[in-house]
Amino acid sequence: MRVFIRPGFIVTPEEIIENKGIYADITNGRIVSISDYYEKADVEIVLPKNTIAFPGFINAHDHLLGSYWPRVGEGPHITWKTWDDALKASPLYKERSKIPNFYLYLLGAYKNLISGVTTVMDHIPHKVNDNFINKLPIRVIKNYTLAHEVSKYDLKWGDGVDVEHKRAVENDFPFVTHIEEGFDEESLKGIDYLKQYGALTEHTVMVHGLGLSDEDLDDIAKAKAHLVTCPVSNYFMFKTIARLKEWFARDINVSLGTDSPMSGSINILEEIKFLKMAYKSKYGEDIDDRTILFMITKNPAKAFRINKDFGYIKPGYIADITIVKFKGDIYSSIVNAWFNDIEMVIMGGKVVYAFSEYEEIFKKFYSQGNFSKVILDRKERLIIGDLNTIMKQVYGFLGFKKELPFIPIELEY
């Protein structure tokens, strides 16, 4: 089946293309061409002219098991460990535990999907998420090795930093770890520990990095390693954000993640808005909107070594596309976007989320029952799977109707 998608603008993300469409092949899920309408397609999706097609957003850091709300354990803390202790001692943590893990994963997946995210990095041991990720409505990166953190506070995820990093290099996977998430003496040793293990390389993806010194950043840049920032979580826990201007000055590859909603943002759209505001507050100047787009598309694709398939709208790439309403200008549209500015989400050339007026298009992709109508943020939507039933089951596990702002659903219970 061949699909033709015609938005007002296409952002590749490095180039802006007008008055063209995207041909995609459902058989392999890939983009065939960006061109005029030159041959009949099985499905034609003609979008309003005030829409922009971006590569499907990539959330570079989440913990899907922590898909709950509200935030717990506000700082300032000196290290993540005191926040984690506060979380696990809280009544909310006990409340969350009533929900089976698979349903927490479903909540996290739908949280990401309705904000335009098509791929997420779920930082957790494989034994936790392996049984879930193929059953979710979004892509979860499968090929990675990991540590929890590189310090004495490490929760002992994986088989040890040296073993996990070696495995990453041998398989051309990313090695993912938290780094220097805090300011005490032990937290600040993270890069030194990585160097001792020989684990600071182009395969290394480090999250948070609040305590990174200039020397650390020089070492990271020299190694061509990657950094991920989660400013909402960082500010909630530590009342500061990472030294992003210093990261950018060294041409380090930087991506954006949400962390879990129990310390971080409710979705990538909130994360973008807070990043814009916090950067201006810290440095007295704006972070470029194009840079932010790169932080949720091509940069994480490079970091997680999936940039031959994801992160771009180009022929041969997987047809994961997020359609956003035009607001202000091309790049500021993602900064200004909220729930109802996500016009449509496409994965592998198939529509997985859209406004209800696209129902006839949905029916061409799915038999009845494989998608559902939902009211999200006061608008009727179509979405893959049965989100209404999932939410009712979650309420059943809890024994009450829980308001979760990352899924603003209207539902009788």
Language model features: what each stretch is:
Residues 197-200, 245-326, 336-348:
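His/Asp/Glu-enriched, well-ordered alpha-helical/loop segment
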Residues 171-173, 199-204, 219-228, 249-254, ...:
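Glycine-enriched alpha-helix->loop->beta-strand junction motifs that scaffold or abut catalytic
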Residues 48-108:
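Metal-associated gating/positioning segment near the N- to mid-region
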Residues 144-149, 231-236, 259-262:
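Short, acidic/turn-prone active-site loops that include or flank metal/cofactor-
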Residues 8, 22, 29, 50, ...:
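Divalent metal-coordination and catalytic microenvironments
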Residues 95-96, 101-103, 120-204, 211:
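Metal-coordinating catalytic core of metallo-dependent amide/deamination hydrolases
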Residues 1-40, 81, 91-119, 124-125, ...:
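Active-site microenvironment of metallo-dependent hydrolases
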